[in-house]
Amino acid sequence: MTKDELMNLVNRSLFATIGYTDEMGRQNVRRVFCVWHKGLGRHLISTNTSSAHVKSLMKNGNACLYFSDDSAFEGLCLFGNVIVHFEREYRELLWNEGDEKYYPKGIEDEDYCILEFIAESGRFYRYDGKGDLSAPEIAAFDAGREYENGYHAANADS
């Protein structure tokens, strides 16, 4: 798959699966709403600060993020680290009308945080082959990009 094809897979995915190690050393996965991307290497996820995965990621940020399209038999697993953000600029970027249902105190709710996944490498597959992504390849592809809602852009014509 080309990097543009991988970016298309990421953008048309409404959800991703994040893998991490919990505080007891067990491997865990969570399905997360993940539509904000800065190329292939950076992804933003809004979530509850009180959730178990956030507590674990604050102690050990090593994680993987998996995007897939089961109907096309395509997948991309990115390996990297997570930073937990509480800064208003991140919260505002991902805040949506109706989020008050989950965060009653609004954008400043202490239970509202943003995970920033930063990829260091990746592995992809498709029916016609598989391959690896290195940190320099990801950085070159992502150069000059800003965060954008890729799902919205990919599905604007729908």
Features from the language model and the residues they span:
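Conserved beta-strand in the GNAT
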Residues: R31-F33
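Charged, gly/pro-rich active-site loop segments
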Residues: C77-S158
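Residue-level signal for well-ordered, solvent-exposed loop/turn and beta-edge residues enriched
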Residues: R26-N28, N81
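A short mixed-secondary-structure module that forms the rim of ligand-binding clefts
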Residues: V35-A72
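General beta-strand recognition
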Residues: T17, R42-L44, R123
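A short, Trp-centered hydrophobic/proline-enriched beta-strand micro-motif
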Residues: N8-G25, A63-F67
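Charged, amphipathic alpha-helical segments
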Residues: M1-D4, D99-E100
